[in-house]
Regions:
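Core dinuclear metal-dependent hydrolase active-site scaffold
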Residues: 1-38, 80, 136-165, 178-182, ...
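A C-terminal functional module that forms or caps the active site or interfaces directly
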Residues: 164-207
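Hard-cation-handling environments
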Residues: 68-85, 89-145, 150
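Short, solvent-exposed amphipathic alpha-helical segments in soluble enzyme
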Residues: 17, 40-42, 101-106, 126-127, ...
Length: 211
């Protein structure tokens, strides 16, 4: 049977039973609240096969709302200075989770095509997200100076980015907890937000299975 993993929309753990023994393979999961997908469901089992992307004690996440507040503050400051805010993140899951936490009153929200297509799937699945547009739909180019731009990491340094002029950029990932990872990305800001469980989350999930 399949059980919600809380990773992204539609993510699931797999429960298998044979000769009275129950095994669960988690796949990717997180325990933090996320309005864009069903929450992680602990499943009692004898053996739990867990992911461990961030399986070290240094990985401990902030409350998501604190991260959203930081992102909105960064966007608001950039908009006041007439600079677009370009936030690089994974197009599936992370982009939609960030969208759900944005203050759409600050300015327009532009999605790269890779994120826009998936965002529409989320909307069709009943997930409430703020209005987003493609950059090609923006008629008033002055609006770009106050925009939040959601783009996949692959867009960095591409010709697509040139239309935003003097922008400030950031990357949202659990890896941004590491100074070296922030430096290698070469962005102005790093926001620590992950769709994977942190160290306390991994321990909590494992304990909850009673494996």
């Amino acid at each position: 049977s399949l059980h919600p993993a809380g990773h992204v929309l539609g993510s699931a753990q797999v429960r298998m039973e044979y000769d009275g023994a129950v095994w669960v393979a988690s796949g990717d999961y997180k325990l933090q609240p996320d309005p864009t997908c069903a929450p992680f469901e602990p499943v009692r089992c004898d053996t739990f096969i867990t992911e461990s992307t961030f399986g070290l004690p240094i990985y401990r996440w902030q409350a998501p709302q604190e991260v959203y507040d930081d992102i909105n503050q960064w966007w608001r400051r950039n908009a006041a200075e007439g600079r677009a805010s370009v936030l690089f993140c994974y197009a599936f899951g992370k982009a939609q989770r960030i969208l759900a936490g944005l203050d759409a009153g600050i300015g327009p929200i532009i999605c790269h095509g890779a994120a826009q297509a998936l965002t529409q799937v989320y909307r069709e699945s009943g997930v409430a997200l703020p209005a987003t547009v493609m950059v090609s739909d923006v008629m008033d180019k002055a609006a770009l100076k106050t925009a939040m731009v959601i783009a996949p990491p692959s867009a960095a340094g591409s010709p697509w980015m040139k239309r935003f002029g003097d922008y400030s950029d950031a990357f949202a990932s659990g890896w941004m907890l590491l100074r070296g990872a922030r430096r290698r990305r070469g962005v102005d800001r790093g926001f620590v937000l992950s769709d994977h469980a942190d160290w306390p989350g991994l321990k909590q999930a494992i304990t909850a299975t009673q494996a």
